[in-house]
Amino acid sequence: MKQKILIRIAMTDDTTRAKAMKTAVQFKGVNAVEIKGDHRNQIEVTGVEVDMIALINTLRKKVAFAELVSVAKVEPPKDGDKKPEEEKKPEEKKPEEKKPEEKKPEPCCQPWQKPEPCYQPWPHDGYGVPSSYPYPCDPYNQIGEPVYNQDPNCRIM
């Protein structure tokens, strides 16, 4: 849900206004910030699902005293509200230019995958646990051990 939030902040100079706008723009969900009001002491924040309480608390901490003035839901324009000039103009059909398909280069390296250890089965004869249980079948394929020069043609840039 897109909404407009009007916040009054104790701003007296351009430095404070810039700091307030910068703080508001960095907040999650904010799309646009405008300075409003007769004394340029209000900002209008437009965004999708903006947490206004957290925004006001952040502005209070970083800039100056801030208070919520109003919150309004922004409705998208309806299709029936189109200008009549747009409906009268015939649509010109332009021939579509075919773009050559872009081929993605194949990666030179395979992504790293964690090797699965292979363990010897548990002895079911009841005589205890072997001294080196569990041990991997291949001692060179241990988990966490780096593999050097796996593909010599691969370059990391």
UniProtKB/Swiss-Prot annotation:
- From the UniProt entry, list the residue stretches annotated as the region Disordered: 73-115
Matching entries from InterPro entries are given as:
HIPP47/16, HMA_dom
Stretches with biased composition (Basic and acidic residues): 75-106
The record's keywords, sorted A to Z, are: Lipoprotein, Metal-binding, Methylation, Prenylation
Q: Which residues form the propeptide?
A: 155-157
Enumerate the spans annotated as HMA domain: 2-71
Q: Where is the lipid attached (S-farnesyl cysteine)?
A: 154
GO MF assignments = metal ion binding
Q: Which residues carry this modification: Cysteine methyl ester?
A: 154
Known role:
Probable heavy-metal-binding protein.
Concerning PANTHER family, the annotation shows: HEAVY METAL-ASSOCIATED ISOPRENYLATED PLANT PROTEIN 47
Q: Which family does the record claim for this protein?
A: Belongs to the HIPP family.
Record's protein name: Heavy metal-associated isoprenylated plant protein 16
Which organism is the protein's source? Answer: Arabidopsis thaliana
